[in-house]
């Protein structure tokens, strides 16, 4: 079977398979652009199982574009807490405000127009355009790339922009009229549940009869990726300063990693216990007791933090920080996961 014939065969086998095997996910109950868009943004870099609860809480808090546009940013970030990549949440609100101000909350119906909105790339634009507006717009992510590279036995690295572009263009040509949304979701479902990175379920795959990688017994050889750069490791010391049941927190810079989020005071180096107490003293907290030393690790996309935390009881609440109880930290402050793991441990003190 020629490559163009493989693409052409996809709708015929995937659509019936999807109708029988689609998972029941909350964002699949609607074609409302707002809800589909929020789900697609949340699903970037995040497992479906983890997203469901976040999605339902987010929709309860902000049921419309207008509600999100009018929300306090701190509330948006708090509901996003734990999903990571917080720029996604900020861009959601930017787009909501833009659509509310210029389009009365309505979404454009083409991938090209959607891609001009903050935080919406080619994949999300294709997903919303096809699912909500039945446009023949491909949504090509890692799942879809893996499917196509295996079916066509293409050994080019999938992180080459040209590869993604070519696959998107080829898929757009075979989108079935009136079933564009179902076809997009069928591809997503196949990649998530059957054509998985490891241990693919080839025996139940609807594309088995024309998958070149399956026929040659080389499924897990594909897709090919260029070697990843080694993650940089950074040592950090986190000061968990406590005074009368309240803990010191501060806001990070509005630019860079974890921009604008709350954190426990910290320094980008490993300090011994004595130096950590001296550092706490320099913040005018009058430290009186080192209670606990603890160690945590957090891995970002490009960097690994090795963190040493010191719980230090203090006599004074320095004005350099905001001081909050554990209950307030839980309820009101958007703490990134890197720091949240320390607050969880503080509950045991």
Where are these regions (language model features)?
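Catalytic cores of DNA base-excision repair glycosylases
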Residues: 2-203, 207-216, 220, 284
């Amino acid at each position: 079977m020629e490559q163009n014939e493989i693409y052409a065969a996809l709708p015929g086998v995937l659509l019936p398979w999807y109708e029988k095997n689609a998972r029941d996910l909350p964002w699949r109950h609607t074609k409302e652009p707002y809800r589909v868009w929020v789900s697609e943004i949340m699903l970037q870099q995040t497992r479906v199982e983890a997203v469901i609860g976040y999605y339902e809480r987010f929709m309860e808090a902000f049921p419309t574009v207008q509600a999100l546009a009018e929300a306090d940013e701190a509330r948006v970030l708090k509901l996003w807490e734990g999903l990571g990549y917080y720029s996604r949440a900020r861009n959601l609100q930017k787009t909501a405000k833009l659509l509310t101000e210029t389009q009365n909350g309505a979404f454009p119906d083409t991938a090209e127009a959607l891609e001009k909105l903050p935080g919406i790339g080619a994949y999300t634009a294709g997903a919303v355009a096809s699912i909500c507006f039945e446009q023949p717009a491909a949504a090509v992510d890692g799942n879809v790339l893996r499917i196509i590279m295996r079916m066509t036995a293409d050994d080019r690295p999938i992180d080459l922009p040209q590869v993604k572009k070519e696959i998107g263009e080829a898929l757009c040509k075979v989108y079935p009229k009136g079933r564009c949304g179902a076809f997009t979701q069928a591809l997503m479902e196949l990649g998530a549940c059957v054509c998985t990175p490891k241990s693919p379920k080839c025996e139940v795959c609807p594309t088995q009869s024309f998958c070149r990688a399956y026929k040659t017994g080389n499924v897990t050889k594909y897709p090919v990726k260029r070697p990843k750069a080694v993650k940089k490791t950074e040592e950090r010391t986190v000061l968990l300063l406590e005074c009368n049941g309240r803990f010191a927190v501060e806001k990070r810079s509005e630019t860079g990693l974890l921009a604008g989020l709350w954190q426990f005071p910290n320094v980008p180096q490993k300090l011994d216990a004595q130096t950590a107490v001296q550092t706490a003293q320099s913040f005018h907290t009058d430290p009186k007791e080192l209670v606990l030393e603890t160690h945590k690790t957090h891995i970002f996309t490009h960097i690994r933090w090795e963190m040493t935390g010191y719980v230090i009881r203090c006599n004074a609440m320095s004005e350099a920080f905001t001081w909050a109880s554990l209950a307030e930290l839980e309820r009101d402050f958007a703490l990134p996961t890197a720091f949240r793991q320390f607050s969880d441990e503080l509950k045991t003190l």
